[in-house]
Regions:
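N-terminal "arm"/small-domain region of PLP-dependent enzymes with the aminotransferase-like
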Residues: 1-41, 134-135, 169
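PLP-dependent aminotransferase class I/II
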Residues: 23-28, 46, 96, 198-282
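Short loop-beta-helix segment that forms the pyridoxal 5′-phosphate
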Residues: 43, 55-77
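PLP-dependent aminotransferase-like
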Residues: 80-141
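Helix C-cap/helix->beta junction micro-motif
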Residues: 104, 134, 166-167, 196, ...
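Active-site phosphate-binding strand-loop segment of PLP-dependent enzymes
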Residues: 118-181
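Conserved PLP-binding catalytic core of the aspartate aminotransferase-like
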Residues: 274-305
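PLP-dependent enzyme catalytic core of the Aspartate aminotransferase-like
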Residues: 304-305, 316-346
Length: 346
């Protein structure tokens, strides 16, 4: 269901998780160590400092930001808030939406819009017709999408949200990977969230700052929606480590710029290398690549090289032979291509 299963295998290079290849900023590592000194104290139940600092980036009020123990906790809270009778999901996409919908609303009718391989899994305008016909209570969109890494075109996303606003459909726009595309300022809906009644933007520190073990995500939406979502979250849901690390992360925009450069270079290199090996590589705007090959057990073969990749055959809409790899540092990308070449040549 997910990448990152390094606990049942001897892994040296984990390409299965889509986190920043630069790793944890050194200043954030230091703050995490310092946070241990505060472990004997009750933390701020409202995490006010982190909320203020985060809201300031988007010129919002702290009451328009909701924090969770990772974006996953927020997805579950959103599903409990609305308990939809009908939901619409893209496929393939992140399986966590379906998991949370079923957990919060077991009788919900889940409608799927299947992204098409012949379109390189890009979202197309016919989704608008499906929304009009089905009139879902809630729609989850991911930009860039997971597992293929493509951004949704801004004009199309604007149309979708406009239609959903008229129909009363809640739209959750998952932007957890958007920062690493380098296009956050021009594409994020967080900056204009007050223009929308029923839009919730999801974001996370996990992928951007390579801290999946800390668990810190946030939702941005109108205050009335934020208040409703908070009612479905536990108190003290952010650890002192999450609060202090999150506040420190916000200070490091230079780290983001360097990350985007490395990711763009690495994506070009890795995509070309996989194509040279005869694989079908799908377009990506993000820090991971979806590809297809005839080697149905490529994941298992790479484990012999102590390399872990994501087998995407369990994604709805994909089959055996689809794999996802994260962009990592150049020497690691080289190592992956070398290992795959050895497998291809037998």
């Amino acid at each position: 269901m997910h990448g990152g299963d390094i606990y049942r295998n001897n892994i040296h290079f984990d390409f299965s998780v889509n986190i920043n290849p630069l790793g944890v900023p050194s200043e954030v590592q230091w703050v995490l160590t310092e946070a241990a000194l505060h472990a004997n104290k009750y933390l701020d139940i409202y995490h006010e400092q982190l909320a203020r600092d985060t809201a300031a980036i988007f010129d919002l009020l702290e009451t328009e930001v909701v924090f969770g123990n990772g974006a996953s906790e927020l997805i579950m809270a959103i599903c409990h808030t609305f308990t939809p009778k009908k939901a619409m999901l893209l496929a393939p996409s992140f399986s966590g939406y379906e998991h949370c919908i079923i957990g919060a609303a077991p009788d919900c009718n889940i409608i799927y819009y299947y992204l098409r391989e012949e379109d390189d899994f890009a979202l197309k305008e016919d989704l608008l017709d499906k929304i009009k016909d089905e009139k879902p209570n809630i729609l989850f969109l991911t930009t860039p999408n997971n597992p293929n890494g493509l951004l949704i075109e801004k004009a199309l996303l604007d149309e979708i949200i406009s239609l959903c606003e008229k129909q009363g459909t809640v739209v959750v726009v998952d932007e957890c990977f958007l920062t690493l595309t380098g296009k956050e300022k021009e594409l994020s809906f967080a900056y204009n969230i007050r223009n929308y009644k029923n839009v919730i933007v999801l974001r996370a520190f996990t992928k951007t700052f390579a801290i999946p073990g800390v668990r810190i995500g946030y939702a941005i939406c109108r205050q009335s929606l934020a208040d409703a979502i908070k009612m479905h979250l536990p108190e003290w849901n952010l650890s002192i480590f999450a609060q202090m690390a999150g506040a420190e992360c916000l200070k490091h925009q230079d780290y983001i710029l360097e990350s985007v450069r490395i990711i763009n270079d690495g994506r070009t290199y890795l995509s070309a290398g996989l194509r040279d090996l005869g694989f079908k590589v799908y377009p990506s705007d993000s820090n991971y690549i979806l590809f297809k090959c005839d080697i149905s057990d490529l994941k298992e073969k790479l484990l012999e090289f102590n390399i872990l990749i994501r087998d995407c055959s369990d994604f709805k809409g994909l089959t055996k032979g689809f794999y996802r790899v994260a962009i990592k540092q150049h020497n690691e990308n080289e190592g992956l291509l070398s290992a795959i070449e050895s497998i291809v040549k037998g």
